[in-house]
Regions:
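Short helix-capping/linker turns of helical repeat alpha-solenoids
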Residues: 42-45, 57-59, 77-81, 93-94, ...
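Classical Sec-dependent N-terminal signal peptides that target proteins to the secretory pathway
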Residues: 1-21
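Terminal, low-structured helical/coil segments at or just beyond the last alpha-helical repeat
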Residues: 222, 232-262
Length: 262
């Protein structure tokens, strides 16, 4: 049981792309590059961001990763939060010595510009990456993000409350907000909490939702482990292996091919 409550406390902090669930990174049409370039040159940060997305789109003839990075940087410097987040993510993929300091700088700026992004900034404090580990500070930023409508922020705030053994009604309120906003790791964490403390069937249903709709691999594995019916076990085994295979696990790909013959 102690291990279960550790999972409840940490499950939401799986390193998911929480911001991409709020703001789509899909590129605009390739043929509007010139228009956005012109607006960007006039100081429009959003236009710089859109131009960067086009330059970053491999299906566009103008694709130029180096120039795209310049435009993302410019969009951030002009006060467009998405550009700052993109720059932070770009640094997260490097092994540069200044990696964590850069990520913190860009995420902090994004949080200042758009409170929805304070969730990502809070995660830096939760993990202690680029910032001294401080769960109280993380909790503050999660709440700030939640207050302006970021479901991920609400889910992370709920987990912070749960770790502090706050009233379960308060915890579930914020999990519900996160889950209803389609932040599916929130559904998983909510399901585990319900399963442990309230109603096992209802809890399992929320874990299923996290797997079925949100492709949360850990939720699929949990449902698989808790299932007693063979038909359900096979269904969730397939989903779990498929997600693992998509993550690059070659053994899970091989196992998936085996069960396709069942």
């Amino acid at each position: 049981m102690k291990a279960l409550f550790f999972i409840l406390a940490s499950v939401l902090f799986l390193k998911t792309e929480s911001v991409s669930e709020i703001y789509s990174l899909a590129a605009p049409a390739c043929d509007i590059y010139d228009l956005n370039f012109k607006k960007c040159s006039s100081g429009d940060g959003e236009a710089c961001y859109l131009a960067a997305l086009i330059l970053n789109n491999r299906s566009c003839t103008r694709k130029n990763d180096d120039l795209a990075l310049e435009f993302f940087e410019k969009s951030c410097s002009l006060g467009y939060a998405k550009g700052c987040i993109f720059m932070g993510r770009a640094y997260s993929l490097t092994s540069l010595d200044e990696k964590h300091a850069k990520i913190k700088t860009y995420y902090e700026r994004a949080c200042e510009l758009d409170a929805k992004f304070c969730d990502d900034y809070g995660l830096l404090y939760f993990y202690g990456e680029g910032a001294k580990k401080d769960e109280l500070t993380a909790k503050k930023y999660f709440k700030k993000s939640c207050d302006v409508g970021n479901p991920a922020g609400c889910g992370h705030f709920a987990t912070s409350l749960n770790k502090e053994d706050k009233d379960i009604n308060e915890v579930t309120k914020f999990y519900e907000i996160g889950c209803s906003g389609e932040h599916y790791p929130s559904c998983y964490a909510y399901g585990l909490l319900l399963w442990a403390k309230v109603d096992k069937n209802e809890g399992k249903n929320f874990c299923k939702k996290a797997c079925d709709r949100g492709n949360v691999k850990e939720a699929c594995k949990w449902v698989l482990d808790m299932s007693k019916e063979e038909k359900e076990q096979i269904l969730y085994l397939r989903r779990y292996l498929k997600l693992g295979c998509e993550d690059g696990d070659t053994q899970m790909c091989k196992d998936l091919e085996k069960i396709k013959r069942w």
